Amino acid sequence: MSNYAPADPRASSNRYRYNGTCMTNPSERFDNLVGSDQSFEQLRRATFGEQPEEGIVLTTLDNAVNWIRKNSIWPMTFGLACCAIEMMSMGASRFDIARFGAEVFRPSPRQSDLMIIAGRVSQKMAPVIRHLYLQMPEPKWVISMGACATSGGVFNNYALVQGVNQYIPVDIYVPGCPPRPEQLIYAITLLQEKIQAERGSFRRALNLEPVTP
């Protein structure tokens, strides 16, 4: 299921309390690692009581792998039109995407795990986008940024694709023309939540399970 970033991300501004790159509350950091599975919650309470001992974390390999992946997202250096300007602003000092571990923009799809479709997609560009997507290693994710990438926007004509999801799967949609950098940052946090909730990550990392194309 794809998530849809709201137009005003300020509604969730209190959801996380970051100090640099870490949550300020140790118990919140612990809960984020172990996930919400009730069996692990019961095991934690039976072992440590209400508050875990300092420096001890109870988790699974899946949750550990997901935690590492969600905090080390490498977007591709890739822009199509106007929305790419807002994407570049996201990487500058004012918005500082480095707080979320996603400041490493890579020029090669083989070294990236996030593609941000920032701008309208022409019929000639769509096969190129799909080719770049197929070159990205697993696991990989896609954010559709702006009205044009999502549905064609104001360009409703034969030359443009009416939604990039016709060519590649999309994980997060960001509305706006163009969206503000805060909205794209909120989309990154939604993607991090989706990554953390994935199951079977460790087995797929060891090629023990087939990956759905």
Curated annotation (Swiss-Prot):
Q: According to the UniProt entry, what is the EC number of this protein?
A: 7.1.1.-
Q: Which GO terms describe its molecular function?
A: 4 iron, 4 sulfur cluster binding; iron ion binding; NADH dehydrogenase (ubiquinone) activity; NADH:ubiquinone reductase (non-electrogenic) activity; quinone binding
Set out the biological process GO terms recorded for this chain's protein. Answer: aerobic respiration; electron transport coupled proton transport
What does this protein need as cofactor? [4Fe-4S] cluster
Extract the InterPro entries matched here. Answer: NADH_UbQ_OxRdtase-like_20kDa, NADH_UQ_OxRdtase_20Kd_su
Which top-level group of life is the source organism from? Bacteria
One Pfam family it belongs to: Oxidored_q6
Comment on bound cofactor: Binds 1 [4Fe-4S] cluster.
Q: What is its main location?
A: membrane
The enzyme class is translocase
Q: What family is it from? A: Belongs to the complex I 20 kDa subunit family.
Q: What is the stated purpose of this protein?
A: NDH-1 shuttles electrons from NADH, via FMN and iron-sulfur (Fe-S) centers, to quinones in the respiratory chain. The immediate electron acceptor for the enzyme in this species is believed to be ubiquinone. Couples the redox reaction to proton translocation (for every two electrons transferred, four hydrogen ions are translocated across the cytoplasmic membrane), and thus conserves the redox energy in a proton gradient.
Subunit composition and interactions: NDH-1 is composed of 14 different subunits. Subunits NuoB, C, D, E, F, and G constitute the peripheral sector of the complex.
The protein's name: NADH-quinone oxidoreductase subunit B 1
Q: Which species does the entry assign this protein to? A: Koribacter versatilis (strain Ellin345)
The lineage, from the top, is: Bacteria, Pseudomonadati, Acidobacteriota, Terriglobia, Terriglobales
